[in-house]
Design a protein with these regions (language model features):
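Conserved PLP-enzyme active-site core in the AAT-like
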Residues: 2-13, 18-21, 25-26, 61-68, ...
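Charged, low-complexity surface segments at secondary-structure and domain boundaries
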Residues: 2-3, 42-44
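A structural motif shared across PLP-dependent enzymes of the aminotransferase-like
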Residues: 13-37, 45-54
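Ligand-binding pocket scaffold of soluble enzyme catalytic domains
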Residues: 49, 57-59, 122
Length: 194
């Protein structure tokens, strides 16, 4: 059986990414702040601790994003909030033909979203499904890591096509962050979740 793993970054790219993270940390935190407990509790007006705001800026800087938001529940929580923020209950969402990750399926069901499936491995089929359902689809969820062993799609090409169609694109970047050269938002997606 042939597999198609994601292309991992090189050792040199990994080092450069680590330096980028350290640069972002030193731009957003002053000296001793890095070694402190941080600020415990919610700050009036920010509605979160100041330290959280700084960490969010570190993430945004690291991934060249306009903003970042830390949420509870790791990737699952991030996907839940992204779907809730970007789509309305009952909207149609484009997904890959493989099984949807179980915790993501719970959110899709809870929101009453209507999955429309396309084989992301076949760009022509993806284009056909987008054309056929152009008046229905409001957004798309693209998982960067492989869902099925035979998956081979180029998530960058999938995202580019979906953005051409004016769709809101949310990516599930779990298990891909810091391992691939670009996460979803760096490849043009509206929201990266991890």
């Amino acid at each position: 059986m042939k597999t198609y793993p994601l292309h991992s970054i090189s050792l040199e790219q990994a080092k450069q990414l680590q330096f980028k993270v350290i640069d972002a940390v030193t731009r957003n935190f002053q000296g001793e702040e890095v070694l402190s407990l941080g600020d415990l509790g919610v700050v009036k007006g920010l509605n979160k601790p100041r330290c959280t705001v700084k960490v969010e800026k570190v993430f945004a800087d690291t991934f060249d994003a306009p903003a970042a938001l830390l949420v509870r529940g790791s990737g699952t929580g991030a996907i839940r909030w992204a779907l809730t923020a970007c789509l309305k209950p009952g909207d149609a969402i484009l997904v890959h033909t493989s099984p949807i990750y179980t915790t993501t399926q719970v959110t899709i069901d809870a929101m009453g979203l209507k999955p429309i499936r396309a084989d992301f491995n076949d760009l022509e089929q993806l284009k056909a499904v987008c054309a056929q359902h152009k008046d229905e689809i409001r957004g798309a969820l693209v998982q960067l890591t492989r869902q099925k062993i035979e998956d081979r799609y180029d998530y960058r090409a999938v995202i580019a096509h979906l953005k051409e169609k004016g769709l809101t694109v949310i990516t599930d970047d779990n298990y891909a962050v810091m391992k691939v050269d670009r996460i979803g938002c760096e490849a043009g997606a509206d929201v990266s979740c991890f």
